[in-house]
Amino acid sequence: MTKKKKNLFLEKINTSDSKLIENECNDKESLQRNKTFNNLTAKEWARLSKPIWDDLSSPRNKFQMNHGAVFPVKLVERLLHMYSKVDDRILDPFLGVGTTLIGCQNLRRNAIGIELNKEYANIAKDWVESNYDLFNKRDDFCFKVVNDDCRNISKYIEKDTIQLTITSPPYADFIQRSLSDRENVHKKSIIKGENNSTIKQYSNDKNDFGNLEYQDFLKSIKHVLKENFKVTKKGGYSCWVVKDHRDTKNGIPYISFHSDLAKVAE
């Protein structure tokens, strides 16, 4: 065998070996995906589940600007990747203007959102409608907006049908305090400037969780958590996006909202 033919022969072997290794890797990945509830590999899960998420902030669009407090679509999409898969059914009991539904639309999940405020519910419908394109066709998945009190979850959703809940409840009457804080302290901050972030009271509705005193809020949210548990599948997840708060006006330096909510949910 000439040197040229030998090198060509070895090159073919190396190419063949590379393809075999690639195929083996693909097979291993497929096996991993088939064994997990979210179709993620171990590497993908590790990358998504880092303890600090500092890469999710994004400017508010024209739909989000109508709401007093919204979270980024990127946050919804990360949670969807981590705790669900394509075709799963997702719930947001405090829908707002529909951010959760948009994330579901982008990643091919079915979703239902419940929103007390009629104006916000209509904005959510408009946003979902405007987000349809060649890849998100109307007949492929179901996105439903319900204009009602989220205390009535069981009226619209069957037991054991929800894989994942993603929501951010009104922070009792914290929003009223935040209005003053944003105006006086964060006037020129990046959250108000580059991100177009705004804060305003949700409504004057007596049933609005955002108008309740803190202790009344915790009592009322317990019912929603119970309803949420009923409709969630065995092995399903609930992600509630919250933040702690300060009430210096009443001499309370720190309100551990996240732990109070967890205690109510026990």
Locate each region found by the language model:
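Class I S-adenosyl-L-methionine-dependent methyltransferase catalytic core
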Residues: T2-E266
